[in-house]
Amino acid sequence: TNVSKIYGHGDSEVRALDDVSVQFETGKFTAIMGPSGSGKSTLMHCMAGLDEMTEGSVTIADIDIASLKDKDLTKLRRDKIGFVFQSFNLVPTLNADENIRLPLLLGNNKGNEEWIQKVINTVHLQDRLTHRPSELSGGQQQRVAVARALASEPAIIFADEPTGNLDSTTGNEILTFMRKAVDELGQTIVMVTHDPVSASYADRIVFLKDGKIAGELLEPTPELVLDYMKKLGH
């Protein structure tokens, strides 16, 4: 709520985010779009507690993250937030199964085995669990990353251009899995993307421009997204 992020001072001041207020509904898939420099990634980093806000508040699972000490914020990120990045960030010496369970192992948490198996089945990795990242294709590695984000049953998943390093067929496959995670597992996902086709997998799109919310679109199609971006001068 009322989130601002300011870099620099005086004449060199840059408002990356300017009094942004937005809510993300539980069990829904939301995309954040906007031109380069509009504040998309900054908003995501502030929401996930990866970057400090200059002003405002962020609440995840009824917890105001600005009030947390570093140790508690780390614990919240580990237990309540899942991350999917453009680069897969898998541990090369661990196999797929170990990579998926890594957030749980770090938190000394066995996790819900039934849930983990459901996640593995949802992203179709049953026959790849003993493979290390070097033995997996890019799409399979990103599926492991999506499963890792889901493994701890987080309150929310933040995905930053998750298909940016993948060809369009593989990218659409990953987005289908993310859509399934929302529809079948009740997951909440917020994704930053610049691609109208990727955004059309979401239930809702929030558009940013110059650090402010410029509009929203519900039940988007790629054509609607393109039209809307033209109107906003993206």
Please provide the spans of the model-predicted regions.
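ABC family nucleotide-binding domain
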Residues: 1-202, 208
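Conserved beta-strand-loop-alpha-helix hinge in the C-terminal portion
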Residues: 212-234
